[in-house]
Regions:
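Short hydrophobic alpha-helix segments
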Residues: 66, 154, 179-181
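Thiol-/selenol-based redox modules, centered on thioredoxin-like
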Residues: 162-199
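N-terminal targeting signals for export/organelle localization
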Residues: 1-54
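Structural microenvironment flanking redox-active thiols in thiol-disulfide oxidoreductases
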Residues: 87-151
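Short active-site neighborhood of thiol/selenol oxidoreductases, capturing the structured segment around
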Residues: 64-94, 107
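Hydrophobic beta-strand positions
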Residues: 54-55, 170
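Structural micro-motif
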Residues: 130-134, 152-169
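Residue-level recognition of short loop/turn positions
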Residues: 59-61, 174
Length: 199
């Protein structure tokens, strides 16, 4: 009987040592490059205060993001300025769902590389008609950077081609948006962005 009690701690020690060895062998630490890659792929919510922007809308009025941050939920849509406001399906879909957003006090800003007069031309009755939210031009002839400052700041420039990218972002009432690495992360589509801010 005494011999059996003596064996129990020995057996427990062997089991613990075996499990510990197995865990160490199967969970080998990654190299530094792999750890950096994992860190850059993490999705976290961060403030977009540093990503504030301003630009002229289709009526040449100055529109700025900052007054909405911390007060309202905001959807920012980067649409295809080359195709035009009357041809961009995501922009037209956002206009269709605008009443839902307005009922919940969600602000909407659409941004493109089109000039104010090009956006204004797309809003005529024989084309897309009016939009109930501002279409901001990402162009500043007085800036040394010139065009696409907003696109660059929000990570909406294709690194390989240098062309502007489309994308939609949902900012919560705290002024936060999802980030991957150092750039805000776009959502899959307008419907997903709308659902995320109205629920």
């Amino acid at each position: 009987m005494k011999d059996r009690r003596f064996l129990i701690p020995i057996m427990a020690g062997i089991v613990i040592a075996s499990v510990s060895t197995w865990r160490v062998m199967t969970n080998k630490p990654q190299d530094y490059a792999a750890q950096v890659q994992l860190e850059s792929e993490k999705v976290i919510a961060r403030s977009v205060t540093a990503f504030d922007f301003e630009g002229l809308d289709s009526d040449n009025r100055l529109v700025r993001l900052k007054p909405f941050l911390g007060r309202h939920r905001v959807i920012i849509l980067f649409f295809d300025g080359e195709a035009g406001a009357d041809k961009d399906t995501e922009l037209l879909r956002l206009r269709e769902r605008f009443d839902e957003l307005k009922a919940r006090d969600v602000k909407v800003i659409a941004v493109s590389t089109a000039l104010p007069q090009e956006n204004r031309a797309a809003m005529t009755a024989d084309r897309a008609g009016p939009f109930p939210f501002p279409l901001v031009s990402d162009f500043d002839p007085t800036s040394p950077d010139g065009a696409w400052r907003i696109h660059r700041r929000w990570g909406r420039i294709d690194a390989a081609t240098g062309k502007p990218l489309t994308g939609v972002f949902a900012i919560d009432r705290k002024g936060q948006v999802l980030f991957t690495g150092d750039s805000p992360r776009p959502m899959e589509n307008v419907d997903r962005a709308v659902e995320s801010v109205i629920r």
